[in-house]
Amino acid sequence: MQRHREINLSVAVLLAIPMFGQDLTPAALAARAKAQNVPDIAYESVPNLLKLPTNVYLGEGIGVATNSKGHVFVYTRSQRTRLFEFDQRGTYIREIGEGLYGFVFAHAVRVDPQDNIWAVDEGANMVIEFNSEGRVVMTLGRRPEPSDAVAAPPPAGPAANPGKYTFDRPTDVGWDAAGNIFVSDGYGNSRVVKYDKNGRFLTSVGSKGSAPGQFNLPHTMAVDAKGNVYVGDRSNRRIQVFDDDLTSKAIYDTVGAPWAVCVSSGPHQYLFSSNSYPDGNDSTMSTVTGEIYKMELDGTILGRFGKAGKQLGEFSGVHEIDCRNPDEIYVSEIQLWRVQKIMLHPKGK
Amino acid sequence: MQKFLNVSLWLLSGGLLFAQVPDISFDSVVPFLRLLPANIHLGEAAGVATNSKGDIFVYTRTGEEATMGGSRFFTHGGSRLLEFDPTGKYMQEMGAGIYGFMFAQTVRIDSEDNIWTVDRGADVVIKFNPTGRFLMTLGRKPEAVNPAGSGGGRGGRGVPGQGVAGDNFNRPTDVAWDAAGNIFVSDAYTNARIVKLDKLGKFIKTWGSKGSGQGQFDMPNSIAVDAQGNVYVADLGNKRIEVFDNDGNFKTQFGDVGSPWAICISPGAHQYLYSSNSNPPDSMDNGEIYRMELDGKILGKFGTAGKLAKEFGTVNEIDCRTPNVLYAGELTNWRVQKLTLHP
């Protein structure tokens, strides 16, 4: 109830200051988060973070995640899609899954509580689990077999009846405390699928649309300690919250388009969501997008940080957030091929 | 009408037999294959076979690369052939970068330890000697990706479903030999036929077409030849194993082992037939492997679909050189399991 009053209040503020939106195109107006007058969180970006060997480059910084030792994993689009590991100081350690059958077009990487590394590939339509040694231990979904005929591409759009074990451009993966696996699937199927820890189908939710429980691009996802699932429903510009059985619980729709969400670990969990500068490189969007919100799990906004731009500490299309430590955030960016480590200084610390 | 009656009888008998098939206890070690170099990973483990020394050969899908050439679209790479010692330790790669490795389907080892790969993307069967040197090809890799709606053979040649009278394949699946060294190739996805060639690769005959009648096929996904030269064809889409004599004359069929994806006949005085009712890649239904006499009598079954040890993710090839020690190559689980049976 308290939150609803806040939302109404921010709408009133928006209407009371018409000057604010005067020069914005309709698209930019729509892209601006409803929440206004959100306090800024002080932060800085760590310079010269990742040290790459000669002739190893990051492409689009599509995924970033850390493990329990602080090692940083970056899943990037390059000549081939590649997965790199760095230590906590940013020193390059190794490449994982070089030449892998399931590495086609990177989308996200996450590290589970046992330090297994999970890559979500929207080109191969697969979720691939590596152990901490970098060997494949489980796969979900299946890479489509090559077509004989270039003149007959598969029909566009979602399958009429998406299979239990096949994805259509999946976007993210998460786990509850029991090890059950959640996959956001994704560009084609507009659903979230739940599997048990051994990869056996349990249930799914969602279809394309804007009603509660429907999705218009479930692009990012995080699971809290109680098993609640937070889905960044990007084109509907809202975060949808489900319980562990994928029953709809709540909707947070004041933080713009959630390109990347993350739930931090520890006894007090926070929810981060990035209203990223869109990948269309439309400059009119740059003044109204790019910020990242820090929230309580119930959707209460605590603060925001960042803005669109190419300088250190600015964000160029944040595509994934790692928030294992809620005061040391990693972000990977699309337009500017990099990963940043953001040190937050929230008030009272 | 007669055909419908036969089908009904199969279903009825299959249903009855299914309930009575004893379970065979078995063990598996996962992961079995080990010590791969950091830059070599199994993808879909489409093919697995052993040679007489017990070395294990895995033909796996790794992902192709495509290039545009004028108006044509060329693809390269996509499969690797790896050799492991009998304990599962990585030994070496064979055929790295060869022109005919596109989309791994099966690997088989003949009685002289030559290694044969069947590639469903390149439409080529390649014979390597035991040390991995190239000896012979059957079929030819398409110069570029075929246009849609092409005919039965490579590049659209031949009659759809039957192909041409020669080694011109369109998505072949398997290879086998009789005691005289004659070669049998199942040419499966676009054509639906078996091609017989002599041991030097000279075309002898072809039989089969797409359909469900006797001697017809709907995806002949796997073949095996027994010591008498009879040819067993896993007719996947028709849910049956068809048996032919050495000249391709229909003899009999077995219809109560689900959808046979992979079959294998063990060597030795008493030969057994194994057949996997593999789960389709988009499901976790079925998955059990049957052990049979050559006359089709089911002796037992083992396994089920899943991702754990002793579970199967779309078995695509079985090796049964030793009848109680099987190797199963899985598509969706990207692994090979060594299965020790205790019948």
List where the protein language model places each region.
Chain B
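Bacterial N-terminal signal peptides
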Residues: N6-L16
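Eukaryotic scaffold repeat domains enriched in small/polar residues
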Residues: Q20-P343
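Positively charged n-region of N-terminal signal peptides that target proteins for export
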Residues: M1-F4
